[in-house]
Amino acid sequence: MTKSNDTEIKDTILKNRPNIAQSTLKTYMSSIRNVGKKIGVELKTIKDIVKHNEEIFNSLTDSNLNDRKTKLSAFIVALDDKHNSISKEVDEIISTYRDRVKVDKAKNIERETNQELTESQKKNYIPWNEVKIVYKKLKIEAEPLFKLDQLNVAQFQKLQNFVLLSLYVLIEPRRSLDYTAFKIKNVNKENDNYLLKKGKKTFFVFNQYKNSGRIGPQTIDIPNSLRNIIVKWSEKNPFDYLLVNSLGKTIGQSKLNDYLNQI
């Protein structure tokens, strides 16, 4: 069997995402090779991707949402050089690909919501613009509580609600499991979900999530606004888990959904 000559792309992905899981890297490389076969071009270098970017994009038009999202993400990571300035052409390609991924993610979330919500949950479901209004109001009420030396039960819950909603407003929403298994103290970096600081950047590392056994750990960038909230919350929350019940234990997935509906 002939070994694929796409070392440059693989090395570039590793440079751009040094914390990438081997399983994710393998998936990305397989995706790039498969797209290359589909368009009849051997994609061996970053220049090849740039040269054939329109063919790559158009070849995925008829793909299902998840497949297209995974393949486009592979090309985005390959092109998104974190260490050197990128050309306007590459920046525009990345923007085009990212816009498509965002649309697909939104459609996927909407589809899963329509399929998975119970009738009771559908009654509690509110549009995104209303979520932002609720979040703005909650932020005004919660942020002063970070300055208090001690919190009563109601204040603690108010802050936790703010943290919880921040997870769904400041970054793309994830499943309940991703946060019920999230720890802020006594972290096992092989098994738990946790916050990782690396230089000036901060990440969420997910070891436990749907399909983690097949895909492996996921690492995502988080904005400074969310990082600051988590750090301040860690100072107020004496327990191991990011989100806890009245006994200081991790909350279940259904309970987390209940909390969201009550906010």
Predicted features by range, described:
Residues 87-147:
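Flexible interdomain linker/hinge and immediately adjacent N-terminus
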Residues 128-177:
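Basic, Lys/Arg- and aromatic-enriched nucleic-acid-binding interface segment
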Residues 37-40, 80-84, 168-173, 180-187:
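Hydrophobic/aromatic-lined pockets within catalytic cores
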